[in-house]
């Protein structure tokens, strides 16, 4: 599958009648059968109050009404963190090529606030192709302890092991929070298909809309046949 085709697919999401035909309450069931690295969660996420690169306060509640895609990384990580950031940028590119652009927020949270200062946070996005229009890199707020974001990551299910050279070993997980502020899913590792996360985001964007009119074959079924 070419990247051009993926972008074209993303551009068609939530457009016209497509918006009315999504898996609805079966979204998790469908994605679970389609994507082996998907995990349905459906519970309240850990609340947080952090700071962006400019020192502005940011809470998860600020994004109520949007789908939030968040993950934990740190700038000096030599291996999986940059790959994870690249994957998030790829997914963001597909989302932002569609009408969903204003309905999804991407968040990276540093687990190493002692070393990831404002300049580091500002420089990270452009290097990995992350678009600041709906992405931000968060760190601890003034007065918070250095382990605040690590404890937050642990509340999201991560475990940390420190090796020589202050290298942090932790799992690679992409967390998804729906428009009502519920933690809906995890996509584990880097082997999941990016288009599956885009389709899942689209399902959450369209959730709780009016019931669809009957049709011979739903758009989701047609997409499943393509992959």
Could you tell me what each predicted segment is?
Residues 83-151:
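Structural microenvironment flanking redox-active thiols in thiol-disulfide oxidoreductases
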Residues 59-84, 88, 106-108:
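Short active-site neighborhood of thiol/selenol oxidoreductases, capturing the structured segment around
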Residues 25-61, 86-87:
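N-terminal "domain-start" segment that seeds a small globular fold
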Residues 151-159, 163-227:
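Thiol-/selenol-based redox modules, centered on thioredoxin-like
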Residues 45-46, 68, 171-173:
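Short loop/turn microsegments at loop-to-beta-strand junctions
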Residues 15-17:
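N-terminal signal peptide c-region/cleavage motif recognized by signal peptidases
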Residues 4-13:
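Sec-dependent N-terminal signal peptides
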